[in-house]
Amino acid sequence: MIIPVRCFSCGRVIASDYGRYLRRINEIRSEGREPTAEEIEKIFDDLGVERYCCRRMIISHVDLINEIMPFS
């Protein structure tokens, strides 16, 4: 659905980092390739997302809001 505002485990605000993360991932994908694990790690380091629980929240999020909207 929509990215949670805070990490479920530690309570850190992650919603503001999600948009910047997506932008950087989409820049890599616009080059016609998928991001490597090292590139994803560097993106998180640049954003200041250090804890693995916060990284998990961002990486595992699936944005389904556009698929659900037609049914409301």
Swiss-Prot record:
Cited PROSITE patterns: RNA_POL_N_8KD
Any one GO BP annotation for this protein: DNA-templated transcription
Annotated GO CC locations: cytoplasm; DNA-directed RNA polymerase complex
Catalytic activity: RNA(n) + a ribonucleoside 5'-triphosphate = RNA(n+1) + diphosphate
Pfam families in UniProt: RNA_pol_N
Residues forming coiled coils: none
Keyword Repeat found: no
Cofactor binding summary note: Binds 1 zinc ion.
Keywords of the record: Cytoplasm, DNA-directed RNA polymerase, Metal-binding, Nucleotidyltransferase, Transcription, Transferase, Zinc
Group of enzyme by EC: transferase
Cofactor: Zn(2+)
Keyword Zinc: yes
Subcellular location: Cytoplasm
InterPro entries the UniProt entry points to: RNA_pol_su_RPB10, RNA_pol_suN_Zn-BS, RPABC5/Rpb10
Main location: cytoplasm
Residue numbers binding Zn(2+): C7, C10, C53, C54
EC code: 2.7.7.6
GO molecular function, one term: zinc ion binding
Function: DNA-dependent RNA polymerase (RNAP) catalyzes the transcription of DNA into RNA using the four ribonucleoside triphosphates as substrates.
Assembly and oligomerization: Part of the RNA polymerase complex.
PANTHER family: DNA-DIRECTED RNA POLYMERASES I, II, AND III SUBUNIT RPABC5 (PTHR23431:SF3), DNA-DIRECTED RNA POLYMERASES I, II, AND III SUBUNIT RPABC5 FAMILY MEMBER (PTHR23431)
Assigned protein family: Belongs to the archaeal Rpo10/eukaryotic RPB10 RNA polymerase subunit family.
The protein, known as: DNA-directed RNA polymerase subunit Rpo10
